[in-house]
């Protein structure tokens, strides 16, 4: 007999799941509260430079030691976000982490960028009325990533180490290590082989 998976387990593994679920409702509420707490703190008189990173460590599933997050961040669950050490994300970014978002060491994400893992059936009858039939495709980003401002990364994308994404790009497919990509949809501009 196959094990019965929770809606959360289905969600993070890319299986179809019901969005309206008590456990998922609680996780979304927790994320909204921590999100609000963080965004209200940054730049306020109470911002001592220590409380913000503590909130992010509570909000994200896992983080490296040095994590810098600017104000205006929005997440769906938070717990499905895993970032490496020396991670930087600029202001007003959206991390739609219905599915896992994994980002390696030394990543930099520009302002107003968006990472989406949620997707929906192509069949119209399966989407009508906000159907419970949702599914996810995780995003994986390697070490030393640099994404310019207003970058959008769509569900299921994997980007290798040392990838650079030009500002305003929409990344619809995966690219290997050392790729420099840009455009809508993003295309390979050239390879960037590190010299050090």
UniProtKB/Swiss-Prot annotation:
Signal peptide: none annotated. Keywords: Acyltransferase, Transferase. One of its GO terms (molecular function) is acetyltransferase activity. Its EC number is 2.3.1.-. It comes from the Eukaryota. It is an enzyme of class 2 (transferase). Belongs to the transferase hexapeptide repeat family. This is Putative acetyltransferase DDB_G0275507.
């Amino acid at each position: 007999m196959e094990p019965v998976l929770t809606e959360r387990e289905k969600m993070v593994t890319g299986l179809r799941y019901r969005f309206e679920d008590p456990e998922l409702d609680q996780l979304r509420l927790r994320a909204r509260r921590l999100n609000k707490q963080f965004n209200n703190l940054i730049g306020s008189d109470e911002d001592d430079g220590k409380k913000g990173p503590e909130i992010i460590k509570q909000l994200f599933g896992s983080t490296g030691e040095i994590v810098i997050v600017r104000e205006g961040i929005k997440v769906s669950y938070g717990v499905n976000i895993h970032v490496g050490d020396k991670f930087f994300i600029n202001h007003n970014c959206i991390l739609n982490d219905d599915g896992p978002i994994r980002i390696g060491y030394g990543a930099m994400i520009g302002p107003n960028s968006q990472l989406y893992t949620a997707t929906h059936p192509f069949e119209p009858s399966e989407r009508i009325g906000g159907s419970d039939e949702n599914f996810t495709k995780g995003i994986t980003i390697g070490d030393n990533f640099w994404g310019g401002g207003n970058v959008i990364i769509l569900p299921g994308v994997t980007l290798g180490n040392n990838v650079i994404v030009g500002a305003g790009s929409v990344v619809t497919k995966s690219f290997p290590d050392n790729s420099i990509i840009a455009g809508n949809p993003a295309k390979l501009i050239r390879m960037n082989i590190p010299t050090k």
